[in-house]
Amino acid sequence: MPLPTSLTTLDGTPLAPEVIADKVVLFVNVASKCGLTPQYSGLVALDKAYGEKGLVIIGVPCNQFGAQEPGSPEEIKDFTKTKYDVDFTLLEKQDVNGPNRSPLYQFLVGDGEDISWNFGKFLIGRDGQVVARFDPQTKPDDTNLKAAIEKALG
């Protein structure tokens, strides 16, 4: 199963395929009212450090874990911009587990275990395949995560 190319941003517009084509992409299921929400700061730092080298960070709001992302698209966008200065792409809210798991997360999880909580991370190589998965407790400044990003970037 290939990486889905028909993705919709938080503001309801289609994500242009060239945004992720031939790029290294870090998908992260995010939430605004979680103990791990401060990871947004680290994701912004990763975006600044590796964005020009070909890393694309994409946040995927999800309300499946403790209803910690209840906001509307506008509320999510305002919160992330105001509190964390998020400039990377946020997709529309999605289910990452269960019978309504989005096609994106069907691809990312594959035959693996369900996502355990907010801020699970999937690193996609330039070939569009999953090269690494990191649990929610792995912070964006983790040396193993950075090493995987650098390796994928070449």
UniProtKB/Swiss-Prot annotation:
| Keyword line | NADP, Oxidoreductase, Peroxidase
The terms under GO molecular function for this entry are:
peroxidase activity
The cross-references to InterPro entries, in alphabetical order and at most eight, read: Glutathione_peroxidase (IPR000889), GPX_AS (IPR029759), Thioredoxin-like_sf (IPR036249)
Q: Which domain of life is it from?
A: Bacteria
How is the activity of this protein governed by pH, according to its UniProt record?
Optimum pH is 8.2.
- What EC number(s) are associated with this protein in UniProt? 1.11.1.22
Sorted alphabetically, the Gene Ontology BP terms of this entry are: cellular response to oxidative stress
Query: Which EC class is this protein assigned?
Result: oxidoreductase
Reported induction: High light, methylviologen, and salt stress conditions increase the expression level.
How does its activity depend on thermal conditions? Optimum temperature is 37 degrees Celsius.
Q: Known activity regulation?
A: Mercaptosuccinate, pCMB, and nethylmaleimide act as inhibitors of the catalytic activity.
State the active site. Answer: C34
Catalyzed chemical reaction(s): a hydroperoxy polyunsaturated fatty acid + NADPH + H(+) = a hydroxy polyunsaturated fatty acid + NADP(+) + H2O
- Protein family (similarity comment): Belongs to the glutathione peroxidase family.
On assembly, the entry states:
Monomer.
This molecule's function is given as:
Hydroperoxy fatty acid reductase essential for the removal of lipid hydroperoxides under normal and stress conditions, leading to the protection of membrane integrity.
Full protein name: Hydroperoxy fatty acid reductase Gpx2
Task: Look up and give the organism this protein is from.
Answer: Synechocystis sp. (strain ATCC 27184 / PCC 6803 / Kazusa)
Name the gene behind this protein: gpx2
